[in-house]
C-alpha cells in the first residue's frame, strides 16, 4: 500500500497510484507518466519511484 500523503510536503498522492502503476506496466516511461499526472515536486515523485509493494510478501505472516 502506498502512503496516502507525501512524507515531505503532505500532498495527497495515493489517488494517482493505480493509474501510475497501470501505465508504467503498459510500457510508458515513469517520468512521462508522472508529468502527465501533474506530479511535479521531487519529493512526491520519489514516493512513486521508490515504492515497493510488500502487502503480498507480508500477508502470509498475519
Curated annotation (Swiss-Prot):
Zn(2+) binds at residues 6, 9, 43-44. GO terms for biological process: DNA-templated transcription. The keyword Disulfide bond does not apply. It is an enzyme of class 2 (transferase). Pfam families: RNA_pol_N. It is found in: Cytoplasm. Keywords: Cytoplasm, DNA-directed RNA polymerase, Metal-binding, Nucleotidyltransferase, Transcription, Transferase, Zinc. Belongs to the archaeal Rpo10/eukaryotic RPB10 RNA polymerase subunit family. Part of the RNA polymerase complex. DNA-dependent RNA polymerase (RNAP) catalyzes the transcription of DNA into RNA using the four ribonucleoside triphosphates as substrates. This is DNA-directed RNA polymerase subunit Rpo10. The lineage of its organism: Archaea, Methanobacteriati, Methanobacteriota, Stenosarchaea group, Methanomicrobia. The gene is rpo10.
